């Protein structure tokens, strides 16, 4: 920077990585990986867990960068699905006919990514100190967790659970894309909001989850790369880079395991366990804040 002043986001990014050690990075990578693809909000848990353990909030930048591990996991797990969609899109462009299953899925992913990209740009432009925003307070996260848990429960109850990937259309991608944009609010859960939207559209549980994972690839990748770029421009040192690398690797491993487990689980189970968990999670946090056990930061 020519004026010697770094953007607030860069300073936050560096300080977040600097104050973590390797063990903490492994734990946070586990939290990120285990919760990124479950409908319980990885952002909420990455905020709450380190605060409860006395480590402080790792910040938006650290969270975004280690999400790259989750992206590598989802790219690896769904490599055949992605190849199928990409080939279908290329074929659709050549034939000028986008009615095929892979073309509809591909268009759903592309257009469904637009809302969260716009929302992310607006936040970066108008809320530069987002780390300290009231939306990231523990109380706000707890309330949002409860509300989204209730919405998931309503969707579970009302959904017909009949439609599979072969019946997925562009409109489903757009609907789930707008739901994904809500995940910019900490505690919403990108996986949870898109799964909820998919259930409202009548998708089968594992179908909604599968498309949710594919839909998240562009947005999470872009967010992670932008924050990584800011970190490198801010002049992060080798030790901090090592912490980020360990956190990202941990995130990759546990993300892959979480994806495999959730898809198997949703083939034979409903989502009520996640609904109950989210309500209890939010209730415990609010109770801890009310009793002074936990500081609302």
Swiss-Prot record:
MF GO annotations: undecaprenyl-diphosphatase activity
Reactions the enzyme catalyzes: di-trans,octa-cis-undecaprenyl diphosphate + H2O = di-trans,octa-cis-undecaprenyl phosphate + phosphate + H(+)
InterPro entries cross-referenced by the UniProt entry: UppP
Miscellaneous notes: Bacitracin is thought to be involved in the inhibition of peptidoglycan synthesis by sequestering undecaprenyl diphosphate, thereby reducing the pool of lipid carrier available.
Similarity field: Belongs to the UppP family.
NCBIfam families given in the database record: PRK00281.2-5 (NF001394), undec_PP_bacA (TIGR00753)
GO cellular component: plasma membrane
GO BP term, pick one: cell wall organization
Record organism: Synechococcus sp. (strain ATCC 27144 / PCC 6301 / SAUG 1402/1)
Job description of the protein: Catalyzes the dephosphorylation of undecaprenyl diphosphate (UPP). Confers resistance to bacitracin.
Name of the protein described by the UniProt record: Undecaprenyl-diphosphatase
The organism's taxonomic lineage, starting at the top: Bacteria, Bacillati, Cyanobacteriota, Cyanophyceae, Synechococcales
């Amino acid at each position: 920077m020519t004026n010697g002043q770094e953007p607030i986001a860069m300073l936050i990014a560096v300080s977040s990585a600097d104050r973590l050690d390797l063990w903490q990075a492994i734990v946070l990578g586990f939290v990120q990986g285990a919760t990124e693809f479950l409908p319980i909000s990885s952002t909420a848990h990455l905020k709450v867990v380190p605060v409860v353990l006395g480590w402080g909030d790792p910040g938006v930048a650290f969270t975004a960068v280690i999400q790259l591990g989750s992206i590598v996991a989802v790219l690896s797990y769904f490599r055949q699905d992605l190849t199928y969609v990409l080939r279908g899109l290329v074929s659709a462009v050549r034939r000028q006919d986008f009615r095929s299953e892979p073309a509809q899925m591909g268009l759903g992913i592309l257009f469904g990514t637009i809302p969260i990209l716009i929302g992310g740009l607006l936040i970066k432009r108008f809320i530069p100190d987002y780390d300290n925003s009231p939306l990231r307070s523990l109380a706000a996260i707890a309330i949002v967790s409860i509300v989204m848990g209730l919405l998931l429960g309503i969707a579970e109850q009302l959904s017909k659970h009949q439609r599979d990937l072969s019946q997925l259309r562009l409109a489903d991608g757009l609907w789930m894309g707008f739901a994904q944009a809500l995940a910019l609010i900490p505690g919403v859960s990108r996986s949870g909001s898109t799964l909820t939207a998919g259930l409202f559209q009548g998708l089968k549980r594992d179908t909604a989850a599968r498309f949710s994972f594919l839909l998240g690839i562009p947005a999470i990748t872009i967010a992670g790369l932008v924050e990584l770029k800011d970190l490198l421009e801010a002049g992060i040192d080798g030790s901090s880079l090592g912490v980020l690398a360990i956190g990202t690797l941990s995130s990759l491993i546990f993300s892959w395991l979480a994806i495999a487990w959730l898809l198997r689980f949703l083939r034979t189970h409903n989502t009520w366990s996640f609904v109950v968990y989210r309500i209890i999670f939010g209730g415990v946090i609010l109770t801890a804040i009310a009793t002074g056990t936990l500081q609302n930061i």
